[in-house]
Design a protein with these regions (language model features):
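Aromatic-rich, lipid-facing transmembrane alpha helices and their immediate juxtamembrane interface loops
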Residues: 1-288
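Transmembrane alpha-helix/helix-exit interface in multi-pass inner-membrane proteins
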Residues: 50-51, 193-198, 470-484
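Catalytic cores of Mg2+-dependent Asp-rich isoprenoid enzymes
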Residues: 253-468, 475, 479-599
Length: 599
């Protein structure tokens, strides 16, 4: 009795609830729009087709297995199946795609320097021909209740939409990792095959024998049913990918789309889809790819956090962070103090040119010449139109302070003599980053403008929080910094007695590490409430960025209190403390759900 409703209660509603629970903290406005849009399209498109199948006797339902209410002869349970299947598959695709910067998978197919782009055009045509044949062939095989009618109806109904979606989204379908394209198709498909097998065996629904081919994938699972669930999940995921393709184009190319709202309109999405691939800016795509590579390699905490920032804010934050890391690497890895100083000068000249109202494109390109090719691609995309210049110059001051460790006499007169020196250094290299990040947050705010007092308060708190994160970084890297001849623990704190043994010195260093860590947590506790005053769309990402880094501090604090070594690696760089991947993900999810760590 009411077997169809029981199928939902036992098999479809629980995974939908589970996915909702996992995704709820991570949902963005675009995710919600995507779900609502796909549900509307899927249900609207399926109702006429399903109604025809039932009215012509291809599908039947024993009266005792359904509750009774129908729409166009479709049982309420069947209508709910359209909704719940679409919802489950959509949520899975959104979850699996959170880490992807989709714009990095776009290609200009006319660019001779991009061989993959040219091959994509060939695959596009091959896919169109294949899908076209799959659509035309059933139409040529006749109509009526003959063997294979159900399969023909599936193909005639689904393939035109698949052809359209392939034409729009083939680039992403071919280049995205399979875990983002095939996995969200196959997981729900396999699950629904099992459910369908159980339902067919129990007689919850059945297919008329003269309308099917008589082939079973396994006992009780007809080939048509297997194809139906595979095709419908493919429709859903390809539709989602087409949406992602449109949004990626809108976000990636401000030259064509200067303003993109938080939730793009259908008309704007179509404009993104119809933009010719020959107009895609290859240099911008490659620069973004290089920036993302730098981010993934240099900061796993910020890489995790970037996945919950929306749209163009995410892209610009990646570009900003990549600029900072490129500068740090070129200056830090210089073979001599003189070479490092030269790099600081080159970056200063680059900023002078980028922010000058008098410089032209030729002067800008000339300022990039001294840099490596990959660095040029990153620097070229720095969003200077949205960033104040002073924090970037202050960042260079921090690098200059770093270089004083390698000048003659630095051992007797180190650059970090007092806590004020340490505070100044952290302000240069980290408080500036907090200010720059929040500048981007306010520039991209899709809601009403924030009042100036709140903005100033949040930017000040963000700068302080940047210092706190830098203190955690300093505590973590004491040993690796020492190997390169640097010590950021204020020199005046140390006992200058020559009689100090290595054991005493180690205890002293551990004590000062804890002292700096305590200062970091004090600043963190004082300023973290300001995050809740930021624009709503960015709060979650900022929370994750801060908490992911402070979790390193918590692990350091725990180990200091237990007297354990601090060079543990949670999967990161050897000799450098880091948080294991699963713990980082757990912290990120809990933070998005509203959790706040201990201060």
């Amino acid at each position: 009795m009411y077997d169809y409703a029981k199928v939902h209660l036992i098999y479809t509603i629980p995974p939908a609830i589970a996915l909702t629970t996992v995704l709820a903290p991570l949902f963005t406005r675009r995710d919600v729009f995507k779900i609502c849009f796909l549900l509307t399209v899927a249900v609207t498109y399926t109702i006429p087709w399903d109604s025809y199948l039932i009215r012509t006797g291809v599908w039947t339902y024993p009266p005792e297995v359904i509750l009774g209410p129908k729409l166009f002869d479709i049982p309420a349970e069947e209508l709910f199946f359209f909704v719940i299947q679409t919802y489950i598959t959509t949520c899975l695709q959104i979850l699996l795609s959170k880490s992807v910067v989709t714009a990095t998978y776009l290609h200009n197919e006319n660019d001779l320097q991009d061989p993959l782009g040219r091959r994509l055009r060939q695959w596009k045509r091959a896919g169109q021909v294949t899908l076209g044949l799959c659509w035309v062939t059933p139409l040529l095989l006749g109509r009526g209740h003959v063997t294979g009618t159900y399969m023909k109806l599936i193909l005639v109904w689904a393939v035109p939409v698949l052809l359209m979606l392939w034409t729009f989204a083939y680039q992403l379908l071919l280049t995205l990792p399979r875990s983002k394209t095939w996995l969200p198709i196959m997981l729900p498909t396999l699950y629904l095959w099992v459910i369908d097998t159980l339902a067919l065996r129990r007689g919850t629904w059945c297919i008329e024998s003269d309308t099917k081919l008589g082939i079973q994938l396994w006992p009780h699972l007809d080939l048509e049913e297997a194809v139906f669930f595979l095709v419908t999940n493919t429709l859903i995921v390809w539709g989602l990918t087409a949406y992602d393709n449109a949004v990626a184009v809108l976000d990636a190319f401000p030259a064509f789309f200067p303003t993109v709202p938080g939730t793009p309109s259908p008309v704007l999405l179509l404009k993104g889809l119809f933009l010719s691939t020959s107009k895609y800016d290859t240099g911008r795509i490659q620069g973004l790819q290089n920036s993302l590579t730098v981010l993934a390699r240099k900061s796993r905490s910020f890489y995790l956090a970037s996945g919950v920032f929306p749209g163009r804010l995410r892209i610009d934050l990646i570009l900003l962070y990549a600029f900072c890391r490129v500068a740090d690497d070129l200056i830090d890895d210089a073979p001599s103090a003189e070479e490092a100083s030269s790099w600081v000068g080159r970056f200063s000249h680059f900023l002078d040119t980028a922010y000058s109202t008098k410089s032209d494109r030729e002067a800008f390109e000339q300022a990039l010449v001294p840099f490596p090719v990959e660095a040029q691609s990153v620097l070229r995309l720095l969003p200077t139109d949205k960033l104040p210049s002073q924090p970037l110059y202050s960042l260079l001051d921090g690098f200059r302070m770093d270089q004083r460790f390698f000048t003659k006499g630095s051992k007797e007169d180190p650059p970090v003599q007092t806590f004020a020196d340490l505070e100044r250094y952290a302000s240069c290299v980290a408080a500036t980053i907090g200010e720059l990040c929040l500048s981007l947050v306010y520039q991209h705010d899709p809601d009403r403008p924030t009042d100036e007092d709140t903005k100033r308060r949040c930017v000040a708190a963000g700068s302080d929080m940047g210092r706190a994160l830098q203190y955690v970084n300093i505590v973590r890297d004491v040993d690796t910094d020492a190997l390169s001849g640097r010590c950021y623990i204020p020199n005046e704190w140390f006992d200058k007695s020559s009689a100090s043994s290595p054991e005493v010195r180690d205890k002293e260093v551990a004590h000062y590490r804890k002292r700096i860590l305590d200062i970091a947590f004090s600043i963190y506790g004082t300023n973290r409430d300001a995050i809740e005053e930021l624009p709503q769309y960015a709060r979650g990402g900022i929370r994750v960025a801060v908490e992911s880094y402070m979790e390193i501090g918590r692990m350091l604090r725990e180990r200091l209190e237990e007297g354990k070594p601090l060079d543990f690696a949670g999967g990161g760089k050897k000799g450098r403390a880091s948080v294991p991947k699963l713990r980082r993900i757990w912290v990120g999810w809990r933070t998005m759900a509203g959790w706040r760590g201990s201060a």
